[in-house]
Amino acid sequence: MANVVENLGKLERRVTISLPKDTVQKEIDARIQKLAKNVRMPGFRPGKVPLKMVAQQYSGQVEAEVLSDKIGQEFFTISRAENLRVAGQPSFEPKQEQAEDAYAFDATFEVYPEVKIGDLATAEVERSTTSIGDAEIDRTLDILRKQRVHYHARGEAGEHGDGGADTAAKNGDRVTVDFVGKIDDVAFQGGTAEDFPFVLGEGRMLPEFETAALGLKVGEQRTFDLKFPDDYHGKDVAGKTAQFTVTMKKIEWPHLPEIDAEFAKSLGIEDGDLTKMRAEIKENLEREAKRRTQSIVKNQVMDALLKISELDVPKALIEQDQQRLVEMARQDLAQRGVPNAKDAPIPAEMFAEQAERRVKLGLVLAELVKANGLEAKPEQIRAEVDEFAKSYEDPKEVVRWYYSNQQRLAEMEAFVVESNVVDFVLGKAKVTDKEVSFEALASASSQA
């Protein structure tokens, strides 16, 4: 008998599943007989419980299991016979009108959409390019020096000097202070501290507080008003004005290490050669610039593909991805040490837009890959693993680590497929190259 597939919408379908009752009953009887061999009941030895008693106790459970299995098997058979590309899980409901000799169920489900990808020649992509020169290397060296800063008491002579004749606190100094804060002459939580250190100019303290500390010398005090921002994290004081008295206890000036052989050795250059150090920094910056530009252009390519593609998105797949994103959010909370993160009440609705984009993009990419043979080749995967491993001390061990886990390899395969798609689209789209600084590139990629 031919199966009738009803169209309920653009993607929603329904078919009727009919299961002969005698076939179902035979399976129920067979399972109960098998179950009876191991059933234990008071007053009977194992396997000696009368079949009728086993049936009385377990027939309902066994019938439900058999129907579930048979419905699933029959739906699979129908979907193959009708070439249905089912998206997500179907729902099964018994029909209101049942025949005497058969069970009847309605299976409602969605199918994968037809994906229409427009003319790639109309897609527009801006591709960032970055050059790494001496300026970028010098800026990186400045950052590395600041990460290794040492502080010395201002005004006290030492091997690196005394910080100058002026002993007042300046931007960049690490100061240690006592402070007392009050609102309407009443102390408040967090408003008082002793021997509190911070670096002037880093922005750790509110601007009024830093301004008050600037110019003070050890032993000096200053009283000032400070208005807490309306969005201040301490809700009890947000938007209120407090009066603070700050006492300077210690002032230390920053000493940055010289760029010499010892500095180079601290960066892993064994012989302390400064030329090698700069070459390695340049190589690392170029690798990072490549990673960032690839990430930015990938996002632009994906946006361009979505713009020129037409498709309906199965709700079932969106809902599945919403739940996946909820679980990812809970895992993230758990990694941050949030208690009971696995049960955190995160509403799936907050991920609706993100999930729809992810599913839509996945369908578009799958169509593009299939139509143009953009699958990842083993040699491409190995090349990416090798490139990733270069930034580690023992690249061979990293390669072994990757190839010892199928999930990690699958993630790399997905990355290669995306790269193939990006290269394919860039070869056909309207691409505009734009030179950007490394700093601008870093800022853009962090916002992407």
Curated annotation (Swiss-Prot):
GO terms for cellular component: cytoplasm. One of its GO terms (biological process) is cell division. Signal peptide: none annotated. Its main location: cytoplasm. Its EC number is 5.2.1.8. Keywords: Cell cycle, Cell division, Chaperone, Cytoplasm, Isomerase, Rotamase. One of its GO terms (molecular function) is peptidyl-prolyl cis-trans isomerase activity. Consists of 3 domains; the N-terminus binds the ribosome, the middle domain has PPIase activity, while the C-terminus has intrinsic chaperone activity on its own. This is Trigger factor. It comes from Burkholderia ambifaria (strain MC40-6). The gene is tig.
